Amino acid sequence: MTDSTIRIAIVGAGGRMGRQLIQAVTQMEGVVLGAAIERKGSTLVGSDAGELAGVGLLNVIVGDDLSQLTDNFDVLIDFTRPEGTLEHLAICRQHRKAMVIGTTGFDEAGKAAISEAAADIGIVFAANFSVGVNVVLKLLEKAAKVMGDYTDIEIIEAHHRHKVDAPSGTALAMGEAIADAMGRSLKDCAVYSREGYTGERKPGTIGFATVRAGDIVGEHTAMFADIGERVEITHKATSRMTFANGAVKSAIWLGKHDNGLFDMRDVLNLNEL
């Protein structure tokens, strides 16, 4: 890719996040909407993507076959579901198109496929594209190094009723940031459910609690609790535009990288702090 205007494709264009992404593209300099894709059979196929997102006519018609639109974009932004994202990944890898992936819920095989594809194309893969959340992840690393060994750590997350995976990708990223800072593996210390007689809390574990209700955009709290005091680090999102803007900024940043696997900490240069 060059430093000229970057053409963006958005899959799931008719969804809540897809419409926000279209709005973000139209509001940001250096990018244009090149393609918009919906699932086959969707009544939205054939409509104008701009009118769909409420930003006026863009003369970009919603299609249903990504493989037929690869000449129209440089970077694909994907906030769909794992099985669909992996199909899109294969197409992008074949045609050397970069990707911004905000899909969550991948298993280990899916994550490995993304890592392998990054040998050929540039990919920004993050559980959360909010600037605030990624600053929180950095704060959690610092807190875990100071307090992690002697406090009880709990992560509580809340999302809208339509979210299909739990815990959220952001909650897991918070757990991984804490565990990594303490030299542990999250899979060895995570506790995802408690029910019935559980006995006392085991030292060194990281607990997770999930809420699904109403239209909550996203709330995450990491708690470091000791006897007599506790520290809570919280992020609350009130609009999906914060995620959409971060994803589009990632696409612009990715224009300077032909290949490699990155996350928002790379985009925001947080790894230097």
UniProtKB/Swiss-Prot annotation:
| GO MF annotation, one | oxidoreductase activity, acting on CH or CH2 groups, NAD or NADP as acceptor
Protein name per UniProt: 4-hydroxy-tetrahydrodipicolinate reductase
Which gene is annotated as encoding this protein in its UniProt record? dapB
Q: Which UniProt keywords apply?
A: Amino-acid biosynthesis, Cytoplasm, Diaminopimelate biosynthesis, Lysine biosynthesis, NAD, NADP, Oxidoreductase
Signal peptide limits = none
Q: Which residues bind NADP(+)?
A: 39
Which function does this protein serve?
A: Catalyzes the conversion of 4-hydroxy-tetrahydrodipicolinate (HTPA) to tetrahydrodipicolinate.
Q: Which family does it belong to?
A: Belongs to the DapB family.
UniProt-annotated location(s): Cytoplasm
Sequence positions that bind (S)-2,3,4,5-tetrahydrodipicolinate: 160, 169-170
Q: What is its main location?
A: cytoplasm
